[in-house]
Amino acid sequence: MPKQKSHSGASKRFRVTGSGKVLRQRANRRHYLEHKTSRLTRRLDGVVPLTKADNRRVKRLLAR
């Protein structure tokens, strides 16, 4: 049986850590930043773990 292909869109958006957590970027940080407050853009900075409800679905897309 052939290997399962990973979803290329999901592989660009999510990263799996060594412990198995799935990390994602926050939304609303790409453009029109001049209209957003500095406080908001700082809050949207960095990567955050995915919710447990979505973990299984994303790992299946990543063929893990």
From Swiss-Prot:
Span list, region Disordered: 1-22
UniProt keyword Ribonucleoprotein present: yes
Skewed-composition ranges (Basic residues): 1-15
Molecular function as annotated in GO: structural constituent of ribosome
Keyword tags: Ribonucleoprotein, Ribosomal protein
Signal found in the keyword field: no
Gene Ontology CC annotations of this record: cytosolic large ribosomal subunit
GO biological process, one term: translation
Family statement drawn from the similarity comment of this UniProt entry: Belongs to the bacterial ribosomal protein bL35 family.
HAMAP family per UniProt: Ribosomal_bL35
Protein name: Large ribosomal subunit protein bL35
